[in-house]
Regions:
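Conserved mid-core segment of classical short-chain dehydrogenase/reductases
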Residues: 75, 85-101, 120, 145
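C-terminal helical subdomain
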Residues: 178, 186, 197-245
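Conserved glycine-rich Rossmann-like NAD(P)H-binding loop of the short-chain dehydrogenase/reductase
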Residues: 27-43
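Residue(s) in the substrate-gating loop at a strand-loop-helix junction
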Residues: 136
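Rossmann-fold cofactor-recognition segment
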Residues: 43-56
Length: 245
């Protein structure tokens, strides 16, 4: 009997929105799925309970990466870092400091630290490796009322470009890419649409897009993201979903 391929998949924020859609559309049978989130509850997934806005939770994720990878010889290992938050929306000089700090820790610091942990856990491993960072069009365009979110996504894109250069010197190395998923019909998008146009002017455009049915379905976007694993993309690529559909 031919043994089954061992496939390990981690998705941060798999309990809702795009993360839940990614978990529901995994294109592999018998994959070991791990949901990194506060709530958990993702069907078919094991759960690492982690509030990624709290740095004390990051070592828990690092430990899980290492234990699962070292427990066997995986042929394919994937980490999709999707977790993020818009809260607090509003001008940087007016929003709550505690919420703003959590935003920076989750959107900026956690992404880079967990990316590092994943790469470190795989260092020297002879298997197919993919790290996908979910970015945003906000990385390229400033949106009033979303300063820390915009800065975080821009930082993630530059991190991917830089780490991609580093991974080209590794054999086999990890393919590291960033993808902006576009405007999706999720609870996070609803939060943005519900914000005041005085504080977040772009919210009006998204309300119009919803009225016109122009917001993408999470499942469709998720399937496109999964298709990136089979595409001939260079490590360090920074993409928009419209460029690959």
């Amino acid at each position: 009997m031919i043994p089954l391929r061992r496939i390990l998949i981690w998705i941060s924020g798999a309990s809702a929105g795009l993360g839940a859609a990614l978990a529901a559309t995994i294109p592999f049978e018998n994959a070991e799925l791990v949901d990194i989130s506060r709530r958990g509850g993702t069907p078919g997934a094991q759960h690492v309970a982690a509030d990624l806005a709290d740095p004390e939770s990051w070592p828990l994720v690092d430990k899980d990466f290492r234990q699962r990878i070292e427990a066997g010889d995986p042929e394919l290992v994937v980490f999709i870092h999707n977790a993020g938050t818009l809260t607090p929306l509003g001008s940087a000089d007016r929003v709550d400091t505690q919420q703003y700090t959590r935003n920076v820790l989750l959107n900026s610091a956690a992404a880079l630290v967990l990316g590092h942990s994943f790469l470190s856990a795989l260092s020297g491993r002879n298997c197919e490796q993919h790290l996908i960072m979910v970015s945003s069009g906000a990385a390229m365009r400033p949106h009033e009322g979303e300063a820390s979110y915009c800065a975080a996504k821009a930082g993630i894109d530059q991190w991917v470009r830089t780490v991609g250069l580093e991974q080209r010197h590794r054999s086999p190395g990890c393919r590291v890419i960033s993808v902006s998923p576009g405007s999706i019909d999720t609870d996070m998008q609803a939060e943005l649409r519900a914000s005041s146009p005085d504080e977040v002017p772009v919210s009006q455009r998204f309300r119009e897009m919803e009225a016109l049915g122009q917001l993408a379905k999470p499942e469709i976007v998720a399937r496109t993201i999964w298709s990136l694993l089979d595409r001939d993309l260079e490590t360090g690529a920074v993409l928009h979903i419209r460029d690959v559909t």
